[in-house]
Amino acid sequence: IGAGCFDTGLKIYHYGSIIVNPKSRIGKNCTIHGNCCIGSKGGIPDDSPVIGDNVDIGQNAQILGGITVADGVRIGAGAIVTKSILIPDVTVVGIPAKVIEK
């Protein structure tokens, strides 16, 4: 985890193996559950996610590549997010992650 990745109000539940690429940016009041990976995809270290405010990242979720996650998104346990989620306040689940609830 790199310095300056997180804004204020971060909550980590069930911590343990949480991987965050130092180039990732995570907004205010986000929640991360254990065994998550927030990082680059395909060996391109500068290609890392930008995550909005109030995002909830479920257990074992992976957010990969130079994508954007909008404010208020809920990412389900085990989801793999490889494309931007630009609609705020939705729930995404699955492999690959898809919107199931607005």
Question: Where would I find each of the regions flagged by the language model?
Answer:
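Left-handed beta-helix
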Residues: 2-3, 8-9, 13-22, 27-28, ...
